[in-house]
């Protein structure tokens, strides 16, 4: 299972402060999907969501 793509339809800059952790395919926990999306903007290879909840 390669995970699922993050839903990155957010108004940037800034993310909502909701705490809905997701586990990225990089092994890191992100406080919400938006923060994972912001990390993806800095990368060549996007992180996907491995599972909902912390890693």
UniProtKB/Swiss-Prot annotation:
GO terms for molecular function: serine-type endopeptidase inhibitor activity. Residues 2-55 form the Kazal-like domain. InterPro entries: Kazal_dom, Kazal_dom_sf, Prot_inh_Kazal-m. PROSITE patterns: KAZAL_1, KAZAL_2. It is found in: Secreted. The keyword Secreted applies. The keyword Disulfide bond applies. One of its GO terms (cellular component) is extracellular region. Transmembrane segments: none annotated. The record marks 17-18 as: Reactive bond for trypsin. SMART domains: KAZAL. Keywords: Disulfide bond, Protease inhibitor, Secreted, Serine protease inhibitor. The record marks 19-20 as: Necessary for sperm binding. Disulfide bonds join 8-37, 15-34, 23-55. Serine protease inhibitor which exhibits anti-trypsin activity. In the pancreas, protects against trypsin-catalyzed premature activation of zymogens. This is Serine protease inhibitor Kazal-type 1.
């Amino acid at each position: 299972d390669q995970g699922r793509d993050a839903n990155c339809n957010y108004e940037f800059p800034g993310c909502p402060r909701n705490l809905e952790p997701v586990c990225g395919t990089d092994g890191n926990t992100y406080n919400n999907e938006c923060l994972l999306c912001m990390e993806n903007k800095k990368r060549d290879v996007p992180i996907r969501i491995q599972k909902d909840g912390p890693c």
